[in-house]
């Protein structure tokens, strides 16, 4: 029987983890990015923030070379510089966002209880994990989770409430009604949080200097069942193989993937992420591979190295389309 040995957890894949073990690991990692053990337990696990990227790789039948940057991130070989302006801003604003959310919840709900959490590991699939920003419960709604986002949006002098002029890419506006884009990575992230924590709703809360936006999103079992199939396949195809032969780790070089220290700055506006590796699209980088290109159809940005763009390709084409388009 195949075994999983992952950060001190060992046993047949079919056995899973006990409820007691899941709770102990959660308690031991409260504080999340301020807790070293949280980082340790994430390594080698597909966390909910990567669910969308993993699913896209499987559905689009990507080659191992294209999967490599994402796999490297999941295994903990590479990471994004936490001091990048957008990420630093998000960390600094999260306590304020949390306070604003809690005030809103207390006004419209009874017996509200908030609880900080660490990492939740799927008891049946210990290679899946999620870290909601907050665990929430109340007498009227039962048990849920909350996820906070703090995008860097400039102050708007035209809008008196949540700014519609510079809407974050993860929100959609349909006849004046805002909602989370169901095709965005954040939707997969919170569906994963609900599935792994065993809760049935998530308050998606967006904090900006122009006001706040909140949407309660319910668990979608059909969506998650489909997503989970992709996650299982990715684990069996790539992560198990990497644990066995360490081919990605052994092939590591200094410039692939790019060292984040070559970054001079990140654009002061919206921060874009490469759909393939989920890495940040950076400005003013020194190496050609670290540069990026925008698809002329879907308008998403991709790292040159992730889509195999060469100087010849750029010279010969007036337009460029990503593999999906």
Residue ranges and their predicted role:
Residues 1-107, 156-180, 248-249:
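Charged, glycine-rich intrinsically disordered N-terminal tails and low-complexity linkers that flank
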Residues 94-97, 186-189, 223, 227, ...:
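Alpha-helical interaction elements in eukaryotic regulators
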Residues 223-224, 228-267, 323-325:
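C-terminal helix/juxtamembrane-tail motif
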